[in-house]
């Protein structure tokens, strides 16, 4: 009985067979080709701009800034977002092709920052408008923190399923596609909260005993050091 003889492999050739799935291949191809749309409105964006220099060189991560949302798959929001800017931000996010990601950079973007204490025009968190993948706290965050956030985003991309991500985002849409904001009655009366303002004490609130005690003479030995 003759055995089937297989041709011997050349010892100088290397194995060139890769076993993977289409989803893993798609995730791997997007790890080093994130094209961000830079949405900077205040001082946090200055820290991100330092990444372009030769010291940090964010080109080594495959980041290519784009000016059009139709060519970007990552939007990086840095700074305060106001109510008037909210529809524009949502429109930019809707124009980005799937799959798309969001990094919220800085305290003003995540919570509204110090401007949301008594302001009627500040959005208290960009996640109320668009879904956020990575939160980057700080005021402002350092460039090293931005690189760490990009690394965490790449790890998240490497183990995700695109179909499940698309379905979950469609269920958590904050705005409709038509970008129509519902008109509500304004709760701003033009006056600030009086409890937050400093009010000088009136002379009527000071008791007469306290006033008389302050008028009493001070002994001479207490004036000597």
Swiss-Prot record:
Binds 1 [4Fe-4S] cluster. PROSITE patterns: COMPLEX1_20K. Its main location: plastid. It is a peripheral membrane protein. The keyword Transport applies. Transmembrane segments: none annotated. GO terms for molecular function: 4 iron, 4 sulfur cluster binding; iron ion binding; NADH dehydrogenase (ubiquinone) activity; quinone binding. Its EC number is 7.1.1.-. One of its GO terms (biological process) is electron transport coupled proton transport. Keywords: 4Fe-4S, Chloroplast, Iron, Iron-sulfur, Membrane, Metal-binding, NAD, NADP, Plastid, Plastoquinone, Quinone, Thylakoid, Translocase, Transport. Signal peptide: none annotated. It is found in: Plastid, Chloroplast thylakoid membrane. Its cofactor is [4Fe-4S] cluster. The keyword Phosphoprotein does not apply. [4Fe-4S] cluster binds at residues 43-44, 108, 139. PANTHER family: NADH DEHYDROGENASE, NADH DEHYDROGENASE [UBIQUINONE] IRON-SULFUR PROTEIN 7, MITOCHONDRIAL. Belongs to the complex I 20 kDa subunit family. NDH shuttles electrons from NAD(P)H:plastoquinone, via FMN and iron-sulfur (Fe-S) centers, to quinones in the photosynthetic chain and possibly in a chloroplast respiratory chain. The immediate electron acceptor for the enzyme in this species is believed to be plastoquinone. Couples the redox reaction to proton translocation, and thus conserves the redox energy in a proton gradient. NDH is composed of at least 16 different subunits, 5 of which are encoded in the nucleus. This is NAD(P)H-quinone oxidoreductase subunit K, chloroplastic. It comes from Hordeum vulgare. The lineage of its organism: Eukaryota, Viridiplantae, Streptophyta, Embryophyta, Tracheophyta. The gene is ndhK.
């Amino acid at each position: 009985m003759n055995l089937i003889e297989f041709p011997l492999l050349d010892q100088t050739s290397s194995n060139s067979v890769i076993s993977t799935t289409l989803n893993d291949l798609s995730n791997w191809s997007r790890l080093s080709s994130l094209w961000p749309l830079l949405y900077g409105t205040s001082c946090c964006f200055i820290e991100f701009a330092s990444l372009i220099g030769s010291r940090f060189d964010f080109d080594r991560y495959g980041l290519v800034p784009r000016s059009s949302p139709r060519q970007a798959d990552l939007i990086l929001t840095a700074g305060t977002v106001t109510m008037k800017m909210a529809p524009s931000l949502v429109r930019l996010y809707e124009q980005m092709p799937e799959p798309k990601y969001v990094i919220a950079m800085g305290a003003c973007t995540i919570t509204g920052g110090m401007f949301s204490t008594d302001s009627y025009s500040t959005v208290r968190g960009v996640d109320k408008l668009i879904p956020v993948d990575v939160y980057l706290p700080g005021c402002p965050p350092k460039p090293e923190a931005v690189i760490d956030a990009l690394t965490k985003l790449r790890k998240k991309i490497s183990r995700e399923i695109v179909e499940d991500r698309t379905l979950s985002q469609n269920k958590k849409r904050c705005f409709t596609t038509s970008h129509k904001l519902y008109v509500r009655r304004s709760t701003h009366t033009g006056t600030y909260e009086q409890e937050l303002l400093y009010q000088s004490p009136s002379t009527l609130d000071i008791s007469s005993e306290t006033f008389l005690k302050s008028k009493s003479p001070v002994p001479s030995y207490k004036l000597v050091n």
